[in-house]
Every structure is written in structure tokens, then in C-alpha cells.
């Protein structure tokens, strides 16, 4: 049978050249390496960020976690969190504006009953009543007063496991944290002259920009990262923050390796990204009171800037993804103000900026590895847009702001009017900021995000400073250009070929003759006859077979067989032992994980459909284990694959392994399997449909899950090539005898061929449907 091809792939039953095996062993060899970390290694901490290796520091990038710094007294900058890391109980920080706010924070150890303690706050000994009933968590308490000689009141306790606290001056307020970790949240105190509040810390501390508040909250709730992620290894004096360090050149080209024809170059670059948003505002027809659409669209921007004394010409394309659709309907009258749809970007949206410049780094950006980037954040604030109505006061949209935070970098291709450029795509996640936006003179107000009406607010561009580093494979001769075939990476070349091949394969489905297909499905196809359409020599076929197996052994089908071969019968018997539908669902764990893509439905056993669908995914493996004389879905799948390979003009040894593996998993996704018990048939499909019926009358009977599970264990599993719906349709229109029905139920190829040769429209349509399901 044609499905022998899949059996051979699953059982490795094919011959290979010894040279192929040696090459495979050589490429997968492992080597033990001993590293002496030296006397300065922080061996108590594990590395957490695996990057491209050394990327030189740059003054353009603001660190996320700046510190640690030693205890000191200073005026913290506005808009920066001061993350406090105390080691002992007591007063950890105090601050005052010397007018109407004296604020201090006290740390209390776990398991402290209510008692009075003496603390020195602003140089004066104060009696404070404290307690901490938690057995494991530390308690931070804010004590505050509004007059110099007043008494302290306690506010905003924070119960903390990591023993971290944070304070920030921003927006006329002093912000702190309260609640209980790992769910602590921010709160605030009002203060006049808040920007002049001096802070005195009595423990080590870090500085985190407000743009990274989410990181600060993560640290408060879960603790600091390993020491390798902090700026300093040991706490330094705060004055060290103002020292301009001597840094290595940030813009440099380093030869990583070199041969006679090729070399690997590491390019480190400081970059300035300038971008702007573009929008489209469309008015509806009529009297001029209605707008149909206000949307974002991609925006190109070209500019020059200086980098190390060199003028750089750069090009950016800004686009957005994950827009939120809003609308406003002022009424149904022709003179009522209406906006059918206006787009807003919020925290669930992304901004993509494709960047290219005329430096050497982008000249040969084809084969690239070890790509890394660091970028500052930027806030984008919207402006006003007037809706010019023919009569009456004009509504106008105003406000809205988001901040952009770097979320990754990939390779991309920019398409301009004249040329396509290999470039870097920087991805930014968004956070909503103040102010909110509103449509004035309407009821729409207090919404957050950046609307598309006026996203640039009169600015020519927004600007972000940053740097990137990459290693590129380029010709050793700098005058040569890297050969490129409309691709960005080596893998993308293959993806492009596979994409074209998939389109060709799917188009070939209509050229397959069904009578020939069934004849081919009955032939015992082996590995080498499968590939005869590509190469005629046996040696080449052996090599192709090896490559196909290497790819196929990582497929979900192969992995599910390897984990299930020994447990199929046990799984089925465990199903049959269940005493109810719910217990059946909870005991089918061995039947559920048919591949890494299929979720475990033992947690959702609310219907028979769920269980039968899950079991039916396993039936393909059971059918393979107990081969019958009838045709199965894999026979048709392999026959279609063979036919398409022979007809294809784009198939090659390079793309064949991917195509065979894809075909085994994606061809005929909607399958149904049946088991026969005397005159009763149980049929279940991967789509969750299930039927039980009698052979002689095709009358449906109640579906017994327990009986179905028992039959699956002991009886052959048969592919429902002609499913129940088709059988019933055939019987209602033509009438079929009991023996003929049994032959169709067993997927007898001789009977199927007879129906096809007679041009029976019902059977022919069913086979055509299966062929059309053989798509990639």
C-alpha cells in the first residue's frame, strides 16, 4: 500500500550510505569544555541573558537597573524610581519638602506583636507603635506628618517577601508601593514643591526610569535579578553615576573570522531612529456631518544625522499592528455627527520601525547571526483635530499618549519607490500615558491610547537613540556584493522555495485522476520509488531518503508514535474501565497527547464529542499498528503526494524533506475512523462528530463511549474513506445491499474502483473532497 512510505519513515527501514552516517555523526558531535572563571567570578549567581557576546556600552542607552548605590542624602530626579534594598529592620528612607510633608518608611521584620519602638526620624527620636502579624513576610510602613511638630500617622503597608521598596517623585506626588507581594501596586501622597523633596536613604538603592515602571513592579513583587544584570557588582557612591567612563568605540567593524572568499564581520553601531506616523481621514458622503474612517497607515521618513563625525543617511518605515477600533454615533439624523471607525493604539498594540542607513553594516545584510539591540523609550503624544461641520460648533479630538518600549529586533526588507532595502525591524510594545484623549463637545472623554487623528501633534518626527550589534557573513573582498535572491536569510531562501512549492502542490490537486489515484494507492510504494520523479539514480535516492528521515523524525507524528507504541493497548483498556462519561474523560490521559500541537483535553470533558475527537486522533496510530486489507487515509495521502511530486516542476532534494513531513501532518486533516461490531458500526471523526448506526438500515443508534473504547482496544480500526454521511446519501439515492455496504465500510479498494469507474457522483465527490484536503 502507498502508506508504506510513512511506515518506512517511522521504522527507519531503509538503507543509507556510510558516508551519510559519518557526516551526521560529525555534525552532531558534542565536546566537553572546562572553563576557569577566575577569581572575580560571581559563582553564586547563574547567568540569565544569553546574548551575542560582547557589545560595547554606550552613553546613549539609559540602563534599566542603575546601581546599586551606597546610602546617601540627595534630591532624586523627577520621574525615576528609587528602588530600596534594605538588609535589616528600621528606618530605610526619609524625605521632606520642609513645608507640608515629612515622610519616612520603616521596615518591620516578620512575626512582631503590637509594641512601641523608638526610631530616629529626621534627627528626632520618635515613639511609633508597630506590628507585623505575618510569619514569613517583611512589612514596610510609611509614617507621615504635615507639620514639623505634628505626630506621625501610618499609611500604605506593604507586605513583602523580596524585602524591596520603591519611591518616586512625579506629577506633583510622591509615589510608593502598597499591598502584598506578588500583587503589590503603586499609591501616592500629594506634596507641594515635590520636585525639591530631598531623600535620605539608609540602605543600598537602585535607580529605575519611570518608563520601566513595569520592571520596577516586577522587582518589587518577585525580587532582583542575578547580579550580572545590574550595572555595578558592588554598591558605589552616588557620585560615580556622574562620572563619564572611557568607553570603547561604539561604532566599529570587527573581523570575527576570515577565509579566502568569506569573512564574518561584527558591526557595532550607535543609531538615531527618527520616525513619524501617517494617517488616513476619510469623510462620508452626504451633508458633511459624518466621517467613515480615521486610520493609521505606514509612513516613510528619510533623514541625515552625524555619527562619529560622519554624516549618515537613514531611512525608516513606521507601521502599527493591533489597532483598536472605536466609533462615535451622535444619532441617526443626516445632521448628526458620526465617526464610523477611528483607530487607537494602546497597550495591546505594537509599533514596527524598519531602519536602514548607508553604512557598511547594511551593505551585505544577507546572512546574519547574533543580532542584538538596545533602544531608549519615547513618548508619543497626540494633538488636536477639528471636525469641520457645515453648521454649529465643531467637535475636536484632543489628547492621548503612549510610550514606546523596545521589544525586539529582526531582519526585514523595506520597499521604497525605487529599491528594496535589507534593513532592521525594531519592534516596540506600548504603554498608555497621560493625558487621556477626548472628543470635545461630545460625551467621549477619559479614554486612553493614541488616536490616529493627529498622532504627530505637529512634530516633524519622533526620535529614539540606541545601538545594535550583528555578525554578518560577507565576501572577503569588500568590493563584492553578497549574492541575494530576494531574500534576507538563508532560511528565508528555503521558505520562499517552500512557499512557491506549496502553491504549486495545492494547484495540482485538480489534475489528479481519481481512478489512477486509487490504483496508485494500492501499490506498495517504497522510499525509492517515491523519489524516482526527482532523481533516477539509486545513490541519489538513498541520500534523499536519509535527508527525509532526518526531517521526519522530528515531526509530531513520529514523536507521538515513539511515545505511544508501548502504551496503546493499556490506554484503550484504561478508557474502557471508566464508569461514566466524566470518568472516561479523566482516564484517557494516555490517549490525549497525540502530538505537541494537541492540547490535553482531560480538563475539558464536558461532552462525548470532546472525548471521541480526542480518541480519534489516536486511531491513526492504532490503524498503523493493525494494518487491514482496506484502503486508509494515509494510502490516499501518500498516493497524492507521489502524484504531485511527479508532476511538480519545482520540487528539489532540498525542499523534499519539508514537503514529505508537512504532508504527513497536514494532508487530510478531517479524518474519520470506524470500528465494526457485528451489524453495528461506531464512527468518530477528528472534528468531534460521532455516529453509531446499523449496517443493514443505516439507522442511527445511541453512541456508547464505553463500548467504543472497548472495541478500539480489541478490533481493527478502519479509515472511514466513505463516511456515514456519504453512505446514507448513497443508500437513499441508489440503494445498496448489505454486502456492498460492508465492503464500503471496510474501504474495500476493489469496490471503490468500481464506483469510480461507473462515475457514481456521490462516491466521486467524496474522493474529490479527500484529494482537495491534501493541501499544504
Curated annotation (Swiss-Prot):
Renumbered ranges of motif YGL motif: 448-450
Residue(s) at site: Cleavage: 231-232, 241-242, 247-248
Keyword set, alphabetical order: Capsid protein, Coiled coil, Disulfide bond, Hemagglutinin, Host cell membrane, Host cytoplasm, Host cytoskeleton, Host endoplasmic reticulum, Host membrane, Host-virus interaction, Membrane, Outer capsid protein, Viral attachment to host cell, Viral penetration into host cytoplasm, Viral penetration via permeabilization of host membrane, Virion, Virus entry into host cell
Coiled-coil residues: 484-511
Presence of keyword Translocase: no
Residues of the site described as Binding to sialic acid: 101, 190
Spike foot: annotated span: 510-776
Matches recorded under InterPro entries: ConA-like_dom_sf, Rota_A_VP4, Rota_VP4_MID, Rota_VP4_MID_sf, VP4_concanavalin-like, VP4_helical
Region (Spike body and stalk (antigen domain)) residue spans: 248-479
Residue numbers spanned by region Hydrophobic: 389-409
Ranges spanned by the short sequence motif KID motif, renumbered to the chain: 644-646
Short motif (DGE motif): ranges: 308-310
A GO-annotated cellular component: host cell endoplasmic reticulum-Golgi intermediate compartment
Domain of life: Viruses
Ranges for region Spike head: 65-224
Disulfide bonds listed in the record: 203-216, 318-380
Pfam families: Rota_VP4_MID, VP4_haemagglut, VP4_helical
Record GO biological process: permeabilization of host organelle membrane involved in viral entry into host cell; virion attachment to host cell
Note: In group A rotaviruses, VP4 defines the P serotype. Some rotavirus strains are neuraminidase-sensitive and require sialic acid to attach to the cell surface. Some rotavirus strains are integrin-dependent. Some rotavirus strains depend on ganglioside for their entry into the host cell. Hsp70 also seems to be involved in the entry of some strains.
Family note: Belongs to the rotavirus VP4 family.
Protein name: Outer capsid protein VP4
The species this protein was found in: Rotavirus A (isolate RVA/Human/Israel/RO1845/1993/G3P5A[3]) (RV-A)
Origin organism lineage: Viruses, Riboviria, Orthornavirae, Duplornaviricota, Resentoviricetes
Amino acid at each position: 500500500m502507498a502508506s508504506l512510505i510513512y511506515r518506512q519513515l517511522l521504522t527507519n527501514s531503509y538503507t543509507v550510505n556510510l558516508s551519510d552516517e559519518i557526516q551526521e555523526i560529525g555534525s552532531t558531535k558534542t565536546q566537553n569544555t572546562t572553563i576557569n572563571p577566575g577569581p572575580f567570578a560571581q559563582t553564586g549567581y547563574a547567568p540569565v541573558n544569553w546574548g551575542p557576546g560582547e557589545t560595547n556600552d554606550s552613553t546613549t542607552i539609559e540602563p534599566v537597573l542603575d546601581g546599586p548605590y551606597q546610602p546617601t542624602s540627595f534630591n532624586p530626579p523627577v520621574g525615576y524610581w528609587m528602588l530600596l534594598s534594605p538588609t535589616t529592620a528600621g528606618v530605610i528612607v526619609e524625605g521632606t519638602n520642609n513645608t507640608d510633608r515629612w515622610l519616612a518608611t520603616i521596615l518591620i521584620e516578620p512575626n512582631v506583636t503590637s509594641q512601641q519602638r523608638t526610631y530616629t526620624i529626621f534627627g528626632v527620636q520618635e515613639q511609633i507603635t508597630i506590628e507585623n502579624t505575618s510569619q514569613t513576610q517583611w512589612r514596610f510602613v510609611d509614617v507621615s506628618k504635615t507639620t514639623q511638630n505634628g505626630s506621625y500617622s501610618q499609611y500604605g503597608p506593604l507586605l513583602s517577601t523580596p524585602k524591596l521598596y520603591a519611591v518616586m517623585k512625579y506629577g506633583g506626588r510622591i509615589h510608593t508601593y502598597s499591598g502584598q507581594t506578588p500583587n503589590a501596586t503603586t499609591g501616592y501622597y500629594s506634596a507641594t514643591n515635590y520636585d525639591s523633596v530631598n531623600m535620605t536613604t539608609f540602605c543600598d538603592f537602585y535607580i529605575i526610569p519611570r518608563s520601566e515602571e513595569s520592571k520596577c513592579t516586577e522587582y518589587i513583587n518577585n525580587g532582583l535579578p542575578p547580579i550580572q544584570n545590574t550595572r555595578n557588582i558592588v554598591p558605589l557612591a552616588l557620585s560615580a553615576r556622574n562620572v563619564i567612563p572611557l568607553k570603547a568605540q561604539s561604532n566599529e567593524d570587527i573581523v570575527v573570522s576570515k577565509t579566502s572568499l568569506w569573512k564574518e564581520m561584527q558591526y557595532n553601531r550607535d543609531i538615531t531612529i527618527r520616525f513619524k506616523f501617517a494617517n488616513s481621514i476619510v469623510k462620508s458622503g452626504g451633508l458633511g456631518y459624518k466621517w467613515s474612517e480615521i486610520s493609521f497607515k505606514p509612513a516613510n521618513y528619510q533623514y541625515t544625522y552625524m555619527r562619529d563625525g560622519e554624516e549618515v543617511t537613514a531611512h525608516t518605515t513606521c507601521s502599527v499592528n493591533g489597532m483598536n477600533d472605536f466609533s462615535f454615533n451622535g444619532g441617526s439624523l443626516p445632521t448628526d455627527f458620526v465617526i464610523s471607525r477611528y483607530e487607537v493604539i494602546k497597550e495591546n498594540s505594537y509599533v514596527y520601525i524598519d531602519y536602514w542607513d548607508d553604512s557598511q553594516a547594511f551593505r551585505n545584510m544577507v546572512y546574519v547571526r547574533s543580532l542584538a539591540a538596545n533602544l531608549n523609550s519615547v513618548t508619543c503624544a497626540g494633538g488636536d483635530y477639528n471636525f469641520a461641520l457645515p453648521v454649529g460648533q465643531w467637535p475636536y479630538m484632543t489628547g492621548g499618549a503612549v510610550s514606546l518600549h523596545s521589544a525586539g529586533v529582526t531582519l526585514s526588507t523595506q520597499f521604497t519607490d525605487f529599491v528594496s532595502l535589507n534593513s532592521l525591524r525594531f519592534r516596540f510594545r506600548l504603554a498608555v500615558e497621560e493625558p487621556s484623549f477626548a472628543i470635545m463637545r461630545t460625551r467621549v472623554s477619559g479614554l486612553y491610547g493614541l488616536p490616529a487623528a493627529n498622532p504627530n501633534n505637529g512634530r516633524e518626527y519622533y526620535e529614539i537613540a540606541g545601538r545594535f550589534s550583528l555578525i554578518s557573513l560577507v565576501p572577503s573582498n569588500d568590493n563584492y556584493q553578497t549574492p541575494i535572491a530576494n531574500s534576507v536569510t538563508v532560511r528565508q531562501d528555503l521558505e520562499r522555495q517552500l512557499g512557491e512549492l506549496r502553491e504549486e502542490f495545492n494547484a495540482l490537486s485538480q489534475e489528479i485522476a481519481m481512478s489512477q489515484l486509487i490504483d496508485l494507492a494500492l501499490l506498495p510504494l517504497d522510499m525509492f520509488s517515491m523519489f524516482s520523479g526527482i532523481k533516477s539514480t539509486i545513490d541519489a535516492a538513498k541520500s534523499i531518503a536519509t535527508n527525509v528521515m532526518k526531517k521526519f523524525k522530528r515531526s509530531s507524528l513520529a514523536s507521538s508514535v515513539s511515545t505511544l507504541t508501548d502504551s496503546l493497548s493499556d490506554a484503550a483498556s484504561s478508557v474502557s474501565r471508566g464508569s461514566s462519561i466524566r470518568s472516561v474523560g479523566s482516564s484517557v490521559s494516555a490517549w490525549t497527547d497525540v502530538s505537541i500541537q494537541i492540547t490535553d483535553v482531560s480538563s475539558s470533558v464536558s461532552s462525548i464529542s470532546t472525548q471521541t475527537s480526542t480518541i480519534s486522533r489516536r486511531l491513526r496510530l492504532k490503524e498503523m499498528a493493525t494494518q487491514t486489507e482496506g484502503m486508509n487515509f494515509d494510502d490516499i495521502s501518500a498516493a497524492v503526494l507521489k502524484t504531485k511530486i511527479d508532476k511538480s516542476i519545482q520540487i528539489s532534494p532540498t525542499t523534499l524533506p519539508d514537503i514529505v513531513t508537512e504532508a504527513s501532518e497536514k494532508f487530510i486533516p478531517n479524518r474519520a475512523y470506524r470500528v465494526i461490531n457485528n451489524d453495528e458500526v461506531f464512527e468518530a471523526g477528528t472534528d468531534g462528530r460521532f455516529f453509531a448506526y446499523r449496517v443493514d438500515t443505516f439507522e442511527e443508534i445511541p453512541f456508547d463511549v464505553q463500548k467504543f473504547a472497548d472495541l478500539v482496544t480489541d478490533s481493527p480500526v478502519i479509515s472511514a474513506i466513505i463516511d456515514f454521511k456519504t453512505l446514507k446519501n448513497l443508500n437513499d439515492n441508489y440503494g445498496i445491499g448489505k454486502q456492498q455496504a460492508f465492503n464500503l465500510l471496510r474501504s474495500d479498494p476493489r469496490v471503490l474502483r468500481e464506483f469510480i469507474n461507473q462515475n457514481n457522483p456521490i462516491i466521486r465527490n467524496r474522493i474529490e473532497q479527500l484529494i482537495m484536503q491534501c493541501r499544504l
